[in-house]
């Protein structure tokens, strides 16, 4: 299954990684592709602090219930051996973030042609 993450909003990043975590928990491979603002969030390593703009009540509830942060979900995904995190080279260039690519922890960098080849025939696709 494949998740395409464009938005860097905390809730969407969390949802995308949760979908991937559910897939690997059932023994399925999962690939998450990062574009634009989602990619920027990963490059800035902003995966810990719940960030629900204008909704401190949700952030408080999120923490009090012990819900996993995106970082915790990412660690679970990596530990599964069934997960790949991919970054879009076009988005990387548009963000001017090429110097951050090597230390990003992103497994593979691809352009759209390669992304389309890798995901051809995948029926379970999620766009966030």
Regions found by a protein language model. Name each.
Residues 39-51:
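N-terminal beta-loop-helix "entrance" segment that forms/cooperates
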